[in-house]
Curated annotation (Swiss-Prot):
This is Delta-stichotoxin-Hcr1b. The keyword Protein transport does not apply. InterPro entries: Anenome_toxin (IPR000693), Myo_ane_neurotoxin_sf (IPR023355). GO terms for cellular component: extracellular region; nematocyst. The keyword Glycoprotein does not apply. GO terms for molecular function: sodium channel regulator activity; toxin activity. Disulfide bonds join C3-C43, C5-C33, C26-C44. It comes from Radianthus crispa (Leathery sea anemone). A synonymy between H.magnifica and R.crispa is controversial. It is found in: Secreted; Nematocyst.
Amino acid sequence: GTCKCDDDGPDVRTATFTGSTEFANCNESWEKCLAVYTPVASCCRKKK
């Protein structure tokens, strides 16, 4: 399933996710998540 940035932290409008805002690739052992409030944005967060 798709993870969402907002599940684990502030939404994209206030930034500072669990991970970092990232439009390309995420670091190894991190996963790309989508932001609910801004469809064009995504973030990376550590895999659980």
